[in-house]
């Protein structure tokens, strides 16, 4: 992928909403994978994206907040009443620098840095206000699985 330079006003940051209260897998963002919390893997992969200037973790939990310290990311506290990760990011939007904010979920320990860069490039090079990576559903099980997010696209994607 060809990386184009960003205008300073287009600074891109990754915002990782992280909550501890998962119902299907409690405390999942702090569960260890290869000796470190899942959240740390997400942070490290996000930091490897060439166009990302800073990574933020937004949480309402003190333990998650404290765990961010050694990673080089910055932790921000959000309102515990936020109903979604997007709402969590919106609650601290004034504390996030830059013109581009990429929402990376805290349970994506193998997120590809090139995917993050591709989203940033798409936002810089088009008039799009938002970009969401999607994948085609591969099985009928995925189609009926409530935990698999579905997206309906128009003719232009």
List where the protein language model places each region:
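Conserved core of the sugar-phosphate nucleotidyltransferase
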Residues: 112-157
């Amino acid at each position: 992928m060809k990386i184009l330079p960003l205008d300073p006003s287009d600074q891109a940051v990754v915002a990782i909403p992280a909550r501890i209260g998962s119902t299907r897998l409690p405390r999942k963002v702090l569960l260890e994978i290869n000796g470190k919390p899942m959240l740390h893997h997400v942070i490290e992969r996000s930091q490897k994206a060439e166009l990302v200037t800073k990574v933020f973790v937004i949480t309402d939990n003190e333990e998650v907040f404290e765990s961010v310290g050694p990673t080089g990311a910055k932790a921000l506290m959000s309102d515990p009443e936020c109903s979604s990760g997007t709402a969590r990011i919106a609650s601290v939007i004034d504390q996030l620098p830059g013109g581009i904010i990429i929402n990376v979920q805290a349970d994506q320990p193998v997120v590809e840095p090139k995917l993050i860069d591709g989203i940033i490039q798409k936002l810089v090079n088009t008039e799009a206000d938002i970009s969401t990576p999607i994948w085609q559903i591969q099985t009928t099980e995925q189609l009926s699985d409530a935990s698999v997010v579905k997206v309906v696209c128009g003719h232009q994607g």
